[in-house]
Amino acid sequence: MKFIVSSSQLLKQLQVLGGVINSNNTLPILDNFLFELSENELKVSASDLETTMSSVVDVESESSGSIAVSARLLLDTLKTFPNQPLTFKTEGENTIEISSDQGKYDMAYFGGDEFPKSVSLPSPSKTIIPANILGTAISKTIFAAGNDDLRPVMSGVFFQFSSQSLTFVATDAHKLVKYSRTDVTADQTAEFIMPKKPLNLLKGILGGSDSEVTIEYNDANAKFTFDNIVLVCRLIDGKYPNYEAVIPKENPNKLTVDRASFLNSVRRVSIFSSKTTHQIRLKMAGTELNISAEDLDFSNKADERLSCDYQGDDMQIGFNSRFLSEMLNNLNSNEVLIEMSLPNRAGILTPIDGTDEGEQVTMLVMPVMLNN
């Protein structure tokens, strides 16, 4: 087996795939990249058994074969080369030789048949989404997904496809984000829960792509295909909670405020909040929004005023500043609308501007009880 490949091209693809590999694998073979050579195409794969990702690299070759090589050793070596052609050639018993302008390097390899086979999806359903829209949907929702192993369904993002719209939802029971697109639709209705790890991998590479992503899925797995990349992952098993039921419908108190100013105030004031609750207090009256926090243990206190447009009864409500900051940071609008009803009911954040036609973002944050 012998091939010649550009060092920078190979490194670029391997760095993308390297995110799949866990630092502590139960199967030693999973510490490797799988190389499958078929004349002028080299297919490189990485897997953690739950997620398998592969990409195709153009090479010069007249041979074929499959081997598994150490991911860490190969990545560390490739990072040190300036862009140049490298020759990979299998030598004798389980050794592959890499030749560069600078010298020669020998690495051990395993037989490719030891590497776990990628899952095939028999008769899957299929939906096609522009890469930039899927990338945005993941970015807007993934931060709100939970980390609770006892509630695995809430540790992923819920994909809801229909002939009217595509909806993506994430929640950890303290905050919730619902992102919808009516300008992209599916042929048939489908629902599944995607784990966070493959979504983070996709998020990192979809941003730079202007192609379309083909999503194939069944009850157990999903497959994403775009450009020269294929990602197959196991879905989270279980039923997603009825998120619509927790979004309050009647919210008479409406606060409109400059998003960047509000975000900066929340960040500043939260420095003085309790390190356990991160609680900040919002006090609305007329055209004034008062943001305050207090840490009684250390006698720290902060108080800021912002001008705003507020319609409704004067009220005070407490929020976790970390959740509020995350949400405000994730919106692109100049102004944000916060709708509330009572101090013990959730607040709803929506952007006033900056969304595409057919794009809708709803963010919900649960209040914290104010200690007077």
Stretches found by the model and what they are:
Residues 1-372:
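Structural preference for solvent-exposed beta-strand-turn elements
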